[in-house]
From Swiss-Prot:
Keyword annotations of the record: Ribonucleoprotein, Ribosomal protein
Listed Basic residues bias regions: 96-107
Species this protein is from: Chlamydia pneumoniae
Biological-process GO terms, alphabetical: translation
Protein name: Small ribosomal subunit protein bS16
Coiled coil: none
């Protein structure tokens, strides 16, 4: 079950309000959701309210952000977004180190095989 943090449309005609929810990828836009993570009202002076701790919790567990939800989290909870980015960068560094070590092992094995073949 893939999870996504996305906006769910609410409100009435000409005054749409959105809820930031955690939902299954296959559920409809305005359908069933797992957890309410905040809201966004583009017409109000107080535009949004987000539950930063819960957003971070679900992002750590593998939930993905939709593009609009990502923009809202960047604006409303920059600490959560920067922590997520730093975690992703740390993972990339680990993968790069492993890849470098693997390439180095392979090149030394090839060199040794070439030396053995010439003997």
């Amino acid at each position: 079950m893939a999870l996504k943090i996305r906006l769910r449309q609410q409100g009435r005609r000409n005054h749409v309000v959105y809820r930031l929810v955690l939902a299954d990828v296959e559920s409809p836009r305005d359908g069933k959701y797992i957890e309410l993570l905040g809201w966004y009202d583009p017409h109000s002076s107080i535009n949004y309210q987000l539950k930063s701790e819960r957003i971070f919790y679900w992002l750590e567990r593998g939930a993905q952000l939709s593009s609009k939800a990502e923009a809202l989290v960047k604006q409303g909870a920059p600490g959560v977004y920067s922590a997520l980015l730093s975690k992703q960068e740390a993972r990339k560094l680990v993968v790069r180190k492993k890849r470098r070590a693997y390439r180095q092992r392979r090149s030394t094995q090839r060199e040794e095989a070439a030396k053995d073949a010439t003997k």
